[in-house]
Amino acid sequence: MAQSLTKIYIHLIFHIKTTSPNIIEKDLPRVHTYINELINVCGCTALKVGGTENHIHTVFLLSKDEPLSHVVEEIKRKSSRWIKNIDPWYKDFAWQSGYGAFSVSQSTVDKTIAYIEKQREHHKKRTFKEEYEEFLKLYEVEYNKEYFIRD
């Protein structure tokens, strides 16, 4: 083939370290906007960034030129450093080392975006741990419970 063509949507989820301060509600829009910019700088196309005070959800179109692990590393490393400079409250801010990345079909991208937009509502009914376990079960991802949501 003369061209390398891809269209891979990713739903990425990552959580703060348990020893890290939560992201203050008023700062969430700025954090989401910055992460959106980082995704685009990595050559990907950010469609939605959202989440709550302790975790992030984003859906984006993965660049054909960048491996997912590199994109995630850049997003987490640069956003962590940036968040620490917002306010002294965040001096010990850090993301956990792990993450969940799940493929999203073209037909469910809008549904995934809507899900991310309603994070506040979802977490009135269930914890992050419950939500994340649902994703792992849905995608049939095997994981070690000993290291689940651990720094």
Q: What feature does the model see in each segment?
A:
Residues 1-151:
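Basic nucleic-acid-binding interfaces
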